[in-house]
């Protein structure tokens, strides 16, 4: 009750007036936990029923309409009139109601809107406790002295179950007895019918005895005929057995031949697998040889190009050394002349600005001489290195040629091996065709034997059926003879009782023993024939299996032939691919040669353009020197006409401002002599005379910071990382000397001037710490730095000298993966 008060207090927030719209009738205080629960309620006139209204069981203390335990839809009343009260009921099944948990529950009516419009008094679900009148004491059935207290209802239920079990057993026994009675009645009727049949048969037998007596003699004659036929059939059976033995021997012979064929096919398969493996190995070796040959050809091409480049560099350096030697001799002679002039000037005149200029020129000449000597030493060292590199390149080229020859020999051997394998494939093909023909003939022989076996089997079955028919006829005749003899014995017996004894006796006792022996003989013959027929069936099964195996071997041989054909086609395709690759290789070689020729033409064009520019430069220098000479002549004319005693004669004529200090022999210089106004390089230059091409006098030698001393062709190679493009030296000129035109505008093809400036910074190799003079030829400096690296001939990527040679070769080969390795 306290729980009910708490539930009502918890639901005080809702409208209490709504709970009276539905009134629950006859609500008990408790109900059985698993029993059907019927709920009666009355819908007052204050509520309008709806099909979605429902009645639920709520635990006391609920707060919302969702706290239900279970619910049922409220049935909609028929012929409902608004404003009237109506009684309805719902039944909760036992498996939906709560268990005996000691809680209080109540019915609630919930509308389709979720409003609770009625609630019942609380109740519980609990089992009924029995009273003293319903209890009963009884002894234990186990024979002990224990008294068991139970309810009368359970006791009566137990007794009822026992009685029903006994009733069921009695009914089953009754059914069994009724079935036995019906069976006995049926047996009685059957025996009566058999008795009537026996009576009729005995009468019929009496009638038949007379007929049997008449036919006994004819049966005896037929028996003799049957014996004769049996002997003939036995002889025929022996003949069939001999034929079957012969057929069996032929089958065994064919089995041995089939085993031999299987062994031969296995050997051929093994040979085929070995040849396939050998062919695969040859293909792999061939691919490796191709790759190696391609690599060697690439190396050969690269080394040939390097060798040509080194040869050209060697020639250039030799020419440069010869030029420098000539220039050195020329400079020495110029210095001697200058020294003579200087002594004469010192002897004839006082020190003035001209002597200072001459001293400055002398100092510059000395510096120029030192730089020239240093450059000559460096060129000698480079020439020595280039000759060593050329020797190494020649040795490497010879080695590569030897390896190429060995590779060609290996390729020829591989081709010979491929031809040998093709010949073996042809031989295997012909052998498989011969085996297929042999197998076809074997199949025909097996089919012929199978037909013979089928014929023999049919004849054997016909003979067995004939013997079975004759055996049945003999049995019938023997039974008739036995019955006839029994009837004769009955007639001879003195009484009917004595005659009944022989009739009831078995026919074997009256027979003389010949029927039983004949039955045994026939049984033995039939068993033997059945065994022989079973053996024949087994042999036929064996022949069928052999035929199936032969067909399988034929299929395998055809598959092997197809595989050999496919391998031959693949080999031909591989040979075609090799030919196409060879053609591609030849095309690539032609393309490389054309590229090299084109590069040579471009180099020749560049040399020609350089030669033209050098000529133009020399012309400009000659014009400049002429203007300088004119100015000096004007200055000399303005001086005192006082005669000066010269210690040495004047080497220059007064009317010719451009004579040579030293008789000069024209030399074939590749890049021109920077100290001479003309440089005859070939026979075509001989048409220009000294009058047409004036030479510069030695009074105005080019300073180290003014013009180009020596120009070398620059290689079009990428610079190493960390090296910056050096700034071109700014030529400075003295105020008292005339300004000479810059030749850089004529050298815009990647060449850098090599000149030594005393005030400039020296160049230092970042790898070997070798010091180079300032404004050393940038291309040579880059060449020296790049000599510390391995350069890829395809992409110009740089690698350290100590890097793995295999990695370097692998990188070079990656440029040829698309057309060499993927075939």
Curated annotation (Swiss-Prot):
One MF annotation (Gene Ontology) recorded for this entry: zinc ion binding
A Pfam match: CALCOCO1
GO biological process terms on file: apoptotic process
Coiled-coil intervals, chain numbering: 149-487, 548-638
Tissues expressing the protein: Expressed at relatively high levels in both proximal and distal regions of the fin bud during pectoral fin development.
Zinc fingers classed as UBZ1-type: ranges: 762-788, 789-815
Alphabetical UniProt keywords: Apoptosis, Coiled coil, Metal-binding, Repeat, Zinc, Zinc-finger
Acidic residues compositional bias, start-end: 723-739
Keyword Repeat on entry: yes
Entry-linked InterPro entries: CALCOCO1-like (IPR012852), CALCOCO1/2_Zn_UBZ1 (IPR041641), SKICH (IPR041611), UBA_autophagy_assoc_protein (IPR051002)
Functional summary from the UniProt entry: May have anti-apoptotic activity.
Free-text note on domains in this protein's UniProt record: The C-terminal UBZ-type zinc fingers function as ubiquitin-binding domains.
UniProt protein name: Tax1-binding protein 1 homolog B
């Amino acid at each position: 009750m306290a729980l009910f008060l708490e539930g009502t207090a918890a639901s005080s927030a809702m409208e209490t007036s709504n709970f009276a719209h539905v009134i629950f009738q006859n609500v008990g205080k408790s109900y059985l936990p698993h029993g059907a629960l019927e709920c009666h309620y009355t819908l007052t006139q204050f509520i309008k029923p709806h099909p979605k209204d429902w009645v639920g069981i709520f635990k006391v203390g609920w707060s919302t309409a969702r706290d239900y335990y279970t619910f049922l839809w409220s049935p909609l009343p028929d012929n409902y009139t608004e404003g009237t009260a109506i009684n309805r009921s719902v039944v909760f099944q036992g498996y939906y109601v709560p268990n005996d948990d000691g809680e209080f529950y109540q019915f609630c009516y919930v509308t389709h809107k979720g409003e609770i419009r009625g609630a019942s008094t609380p109740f519980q679900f609990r089992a009924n406790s029995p009273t003293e009148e319903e209890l009963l004491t009884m002894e234990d059935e186990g024979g002990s002295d224990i008294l068991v207290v139970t309810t009368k209802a359970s006791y009566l239920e137990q007794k009822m179950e026992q009685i029903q079990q006994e009733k069921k057993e009695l009914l089953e026994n009754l059914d069994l007895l009724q079935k036995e009675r019906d069976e006995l009645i049926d047996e009685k009727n059957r025996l009566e019918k058999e008795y009537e049949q026996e009576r009729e048969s005995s009468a019929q037998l009496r009638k038949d005895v007379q007929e049997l007596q008449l036919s006994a003699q004819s049966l005896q004659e037929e028996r003799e005929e049957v014996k004769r036929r049996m002997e003939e059939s036995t002889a025929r059976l022996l003949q069939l057995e001999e034929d079957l033995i012969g057929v069996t021997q032929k089958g065994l012979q064919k089995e041995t031949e089939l085993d031999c064929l299987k062994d031969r096919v296995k050997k051929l398969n093994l040979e085929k697998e070995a040849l396939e493996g050998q062919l695969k190995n040859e293909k792999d070796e061939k691919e490796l040889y191709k790759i190696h040959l391609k690599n060697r050809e690439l190396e050969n091409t690269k080394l040939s190009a390097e060798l040509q480049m080194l040869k050209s560099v060697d020639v250039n350096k030799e020419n440069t050394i010869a030029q420098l030697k000539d220039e050195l001799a020329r400079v020495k002679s110029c210095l001697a002349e200058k020294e003579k002039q200087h002594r004469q000037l010192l002897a004839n005149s006082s020190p003035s600005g001209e002597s200072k200029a001459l001293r400055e020129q002398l100092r510059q000449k000395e510096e120029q001489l030192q730089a020239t000597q240093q450059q000559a030493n460096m060129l000698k060292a480079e020439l020595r290195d280039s000759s060593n590199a050329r020797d190494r390149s020649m040795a490497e080229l010879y080695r590569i040629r030897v390896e190429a020859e060995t590779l060609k020999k290996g390729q020829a051997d591989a081709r010979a091996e491929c031809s040998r394998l093709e010949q073996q494939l042809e031989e295997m093909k012909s052998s498989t065709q011969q085996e297929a023909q042999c197998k076809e003939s074997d199949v025909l022989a097996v089919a012929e034997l199978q037909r013979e076996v089928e014929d023999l089997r049919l004849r054997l079955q016909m003979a067995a059926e004939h013997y079975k028919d004759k055996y049945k006829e003999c049995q019938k005749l023997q039974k008739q003879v036995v019955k006839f003899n029994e009837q004769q014995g009955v007639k001879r017996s003195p009484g009917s009782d004595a005659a009944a004894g022989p009739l009831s006796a078995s026919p074997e006792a009256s027979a003389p023993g010949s029927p039983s022996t004949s039955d045994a003989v026939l049984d033995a013959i039939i068993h033997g024939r059945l065994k022989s027929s079973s053996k024949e069936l087994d042999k036929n099964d064996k022949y069928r299996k052999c035929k199936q195996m032969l067909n399988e071997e034929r299929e395998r041989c055809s598959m092997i032939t197809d595989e050999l054909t496919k391998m031959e086609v693949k080999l031909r395709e591989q040979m075609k691919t090799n030919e196409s690759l060879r053609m591609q290789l030849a095309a690539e070689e032609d393309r490389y040669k054309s590229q090299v020729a084109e590069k040579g033409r471009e180099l020749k064009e560049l040399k020609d353009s350089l030669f033209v520019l050098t000529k133009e430069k020399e012309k400009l220098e000659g014009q400049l020197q002429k203007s300088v000479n004119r100015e000096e002549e004007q200055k000399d004319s303005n001086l005192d006409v006082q005669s000066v005693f010269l210690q040495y004669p004047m080497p220059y004529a007064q009317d010719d401002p451009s004579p040579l200090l030293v008789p000069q022999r024209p030399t074939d210089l590749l890049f021109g002599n920077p100290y001479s106004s003309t440089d005859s390089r070939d026979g075509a230059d001989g048409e220009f005379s000294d009058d047409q091409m004036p030479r510069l006098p030695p009074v105005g030698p080019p300073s180290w910071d003014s013009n180009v001393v020596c120009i070398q062709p620059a290689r079009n190679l990428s610079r190493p990382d960390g090296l910056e493009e050096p700034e071109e030296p700014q030529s400075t000129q003295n105020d008292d000397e005339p300004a000479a035109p810059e030749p850089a505008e004529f050298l815009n093809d990647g060449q850098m001037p090599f000149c030594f400036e005393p005030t400039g910074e020296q160049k230092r190799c970042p790898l070997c710490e070798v010091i180079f003079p300032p404004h050393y030829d940038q291309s040579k400096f880059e060449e020296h730095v790049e000599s510390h690296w391995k350069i890829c001939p395809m992409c110009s990527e740089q690698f350290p000298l100590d890097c793995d040679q295999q990695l370097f070769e692998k990188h070079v080969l990656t440029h040829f993966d698309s057309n060499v390795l993927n075939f």
